[in-house]
């Protein structure tokens, strides 16, 4: 009797014939996505390793999609639509941060069973992660040779290197609103990592001291702080997870591993948005 109660008939309006119509699996191209987890070993836990990294790359793709649109909104002096995009990016970052706790279920012994299969493949080579860092203002031309084997990605990386970051766009928004910004900042070489500037800090201080007058700039600043803070948390969780799994071994891509990742924690984003808090 219990089994019958748990059964139910499909509602009459539910479609069941997809011979000539698009289905859920067809729309999402699940045949391609779900056939892309190709293990190079017979070890059970390699599937976890692959899926964590593949899903992270999908989330990064969405971050870049939202970030590109947000930067354009700011450059167009249309700040408000960007706030929704930044809020979404922040939620995506939370997903990415949480994914490290899933990967940390992989023990050192389990990882060593298939690590050699990776060769020199490494998260260091994640071009989407590099594009996110570029978009947040941390440019580094020295990483480009890592991607020269793929002309399309190399061109995309080069273009991003020379494009304004979201912080460059935000600083231009300050100038558009009449806040004095040094000319060498407004016309700087975008391929270089942004360096702190007194005029930018003073402009942000003016915004924070006059919130009602500059509400949208204030909101923009706080959205950037959210994203910068989440990115630092992601970096920390990355470092912590790597240390938990491989200790201080060198990375498969040739980096110093945990030591390299720890150095990245010293490179924060949007410097004046942090220093102003002491002076406010």
Curated annotation (Swiss-Prot):
InterPro entries: Trp/Indoleamine_2_3_dOase-like, Trp_2-3-dOase_bac, Trp_2_3_dOase
Gene: kynA
Official protein name in the record: Tryptophan 2,3-dioxygenase
Keyword tags: Dioxygenase, Heme, Iron, Metal-binding, Oxidoreductase, Tryptophan catabolism
Subunit structure, as described in the record: Homotetramer.
Any one GO molecular function term: heme binding
Oxidoreductase among keywords: yes
Annotated SUPFAM superfamilies: Indolic compounds 2,3-dioxygenase-like (SSF140959)
Highest taxon listed in the record's lineage: Bacteria
Annotated heme binding sites: 238
UniProt EC number: 1.13.11.11
Gene Ontology terms: biological process: L-tryptophan catabolic process to acetyl-CoA; L-tryptophan catabolic process to kynurenine
Annotated organism of origin: Geobacillus thermodenitrificans (strain NG80-2)
Family: Belongs to the tryptophan 2,3-dioxygenase family.
Cofactor notes: Binds 1 heme group per subunit.
The protein's role, per its UniProt record: Heme-dependent dioxygenase that catalyzes the oxidative cleavage of the L-tryptophan (L-Trp) pyrrole ring and converts L-tryptophan to N-formyl-L-kynurenine. Catalyzes the oxidative cleavage of the indole moiety.
Cofactor: heme
Sequence positions that bind substrate: 49-53, 111, 115, 252
Pathway(s) of this molecule: Amino-acid degradation; L-tryptophan degradation via kynurenine pathway; L-kynurenine from L-tryptophan: step 1/2
Phylogenetic classification of the source organism: Bacteria, Bacillati, Bacillota, Bacilli, Bacillales
Broad EC category: oxidoreductase
Reaction equation(s) it catalyzes: L-tryptophan + O2 = N-formyl-L-kynurenine
